[in-house]
């Protein structure tokens, strides 16, 4: 979900800490200009839902002030039980045609009331099994989750300009850092404090994406 296009700060709202990063694009890659991390109590974020917005907002504000950042636009990502990623096989059509029938096509794959979610779709390509069909990726998130994160960002004095899904943000990071990686099967795994994000790529395309409600905190407590 893209709100507008400008220079962005990276904002990661995790269940144990909040990270804010400022990168500059330079020849040959990116340069780290600023990086900040603020710890938050475990009860602030539960199953990726914001339970204590005041603490989250104050932590983001403090990070921005301590780093003396002038930019306000942010890119962030969400995951958890309120986010659904489904692969479907549909008759061949253009992206424009798919957008026109998006709500109808997605309703059978999304286990939420279709009116309660923000929805997007991506055509992955022609089906390997049938030439008259195509593979489509449906991505949906409950509006409440996106709106809660967006509100926290705005209340901290920043502007939510891009909201991604954690597994696909992980994929983008991989593509940026390893542009010349050979096309094969690659498993991207991000182990957070309370969530594990997995994205399996084959020939540069996501074939399996999953969030697991378990992370480093549970492993440490054992």
Regions found by a protein language model. Name each.
Residues 25, 165-168, 212:
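Short, ordered loop/turn segments at secondary-structure junctions
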Residues 77-177:
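Active-site neighborhood for divalent-cation/phosphate handling
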Residues 2-5, 14-17, 70, 80-82, ...:
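Short flexible coil/turn linkers enriched for glycine and charged/polar residues
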Residues 10-12, 19, 75-77, 137, ...:
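Structured core elements
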